[in-house]
A protein has these predicted regions:
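Terminal, low-structured helical/coil segments at or just beyond the last alpha-helical repeat
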Residues: 150-213
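Conserved structural position within tetratricopeptide repeats
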Residues: 35, 47-51, 81-85, 115-119, ...
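Register position in tetratricopeptide repeats
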Residues: 35-36, 69-70, 103-104, 137-138, ...
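Helix-start (N-cap) detector for alpha-helical repeat units in TPR-like alpha-solenoids
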Residues: 22-24, 57-58, 91-92, 125-126, ...
C-alpha cells in the first residue's frame, strides 16, 4: 500500500517536467516544419501547443506566422494580438501584426503596430517606411511626407522611400508596396527556457492597450 502511494506521488512529480518536455518537442517540430514550408502542419502543431499552454506567446506568434504564409491574414492578426497580450516587448510580433493589418487594409491598426515596433527598434528602416506608407493610406499626407523626409535623411539610398515620397507629393496611389523585413529572425525569440533571462528592451512610450482591434 505504502509503495503504491510512493509510486503515485513520484508520477505526479514527473508529470510537469514530462509535459514541458513534450511542449518543447512540439515547438521544435513546429519550427522545423515552418522553416521547411509546411505551413498547414506547423499551424496545426502550434495550435496544439497553445491549447496545452495558452500563455506561451512564442507559439501564438509562430502560429500567426504560419497563417500569414497561408494568407489567413485575419487569423494571423488575431494570433498576433494574443502573443502581444502575453509579450508586448518584441518588435517582430508588432511587425507581423502590422503587415497582416496592411493585407486586411486596416491601415490605422498597422500605424499603431509599427509605432510600437519603432519604439523597440529605431534602426529598422522597413518599420519607418511601412508606417509612412500606412499614414498615407489613411489620408495623413503631411505626416507621411514628414516621415519620409526623416527616412531619407537617415537612409539616402532607400529607393522605395524615394518612390513613395514622389507618389505622396503627386497625390497618387503608391507604386511601392509595404516592405517585409528580409529574413525575419523568428528563431531569435526568447525560448521556453529563457523566460527569466535576457528580457527584451522595454518600449518607451506606447503600451499594448493602444492597439485597435
Amino acid at each position: 500500500m505504502l509503495r503504491g502511494i510512493v509510486v503515485f506521488l513520484l508520477c505526479l512529480l514527473t508529470l510537469p517536467s514530462a509535459a514541458q518536455y513534450n511542449i518543447k518537442k512540439m515547438m521544435g517540430e513546429g519550427r522545423r516544419t515552418l522553416d521547411e514550408g509546411y505551413y498547414v502542419t506547423s499551424m496545426q502543431i502550434f495550435s496544439r501547443v497553445v491549447a496545452l499552454k495558452p500563455n506561451l506567446y512564442e507559439a501564438w506568434y509562430l502560429m500567426a506566422l504560419s497563417k500569414n504564409h497561408l494568407e489567413d491574414y485575419k487569423g494571423a492578426a488575431n494570433d498576433c494580438r494574443q502573443a502581444l497580450v502575453l509579450q508586448p516587448y518584441i518588435a517582430d510580433i508588432y511587425e507581423l501584426y502590422g503587415m497582416t493589418n496592411i493585407r486586411l487594409e486596416r491601415y490605422d491598426s498597422a500605424v499603431v503596430a509599427y509605432t510600437h515596433a519603432i519604439d523597440i527598434n529605431t534602426d529598422n528602416r522597413d518599420y519607418w517606411f511601412n508606417r509612412a506608407y500606412c499614414l498615407y493610406q489613411v489620408g495623413d499626407k503631411n505626416t507621411s511626407l514628414s516621415q519620409l523626409d526623416y527616412i531619407l535623411k537617415r537612409w539616402p539610398s532607400f529607393d522605395a522611400a524615394l518612390q513613395l515620397r514622389s507618389d505622396v507629393i503627386a497625390g497618387r496611389k503608391p507604386r511601392q508596396q509595404a516592405s517585409n523585413t528580409k529574413n525575419p529572425q523568428f528563431y531569435q525569440l526568447p525560448s521556453l527556457q529563457d523566460d527569466n533571462r535576457n528580457r527584451p528592451t522595454l518600449m518607451r512610450n506606447h503600451m499594448l492597450t493602444d492597439l485597435p482591434k
